[in-house]
Amino acid sequence: MKTLLLTLVVVTIVCLDLGYTLKCHTTQFRNIETCQKWETVCFQRAVKPHPSSMIVLRGCTSSCGKGETCCATDLCNR
């Protein structure tokens, strides 16, 4: 009986994703992305492709690049 219980516990742990995954807003309006395990921060970067327009890029990343605003909690890059 103990062996069966131990086996069930091990199978449950293996089958469940016990790791925390971050969620970030994406560039597409109202979309949410579940980040990969190695992507630990959400980013937001404003890009000006034309003098009269601006695009805000959003998503998951592993490190914060130059000109990006980064944060490490769910949906923090709004």
UniProtKB/Swiss-Prot annotation:
Q: GO molecular function, one example?
A: toxin activity
**Does the record's keyword annotation contain Repeat?**
no
Q: What is the tissue localization of expression for this protein?
A: Expressed by the venom gland.
Disulfide-linked positions: 24-42, 35-60, 64-70, 71-76
Query: Which positions carry the signal peptide feature in this UniProt record?
Result: 1-21
* Keyword field: Disulfide bond, Neurotoxin, Postsynaptic neurotoxin, Secreted, Signal, Toxin
Keyword Disulfide bond applies: yes
State what protein this is by name: Neurotoxin 3FTx-LK
Its source organism is Bungarus fasciatus
What lineage does the source organism belong to? Answer: Eukaryota, Metazoa, Chordata, Craniata, Vertebrata
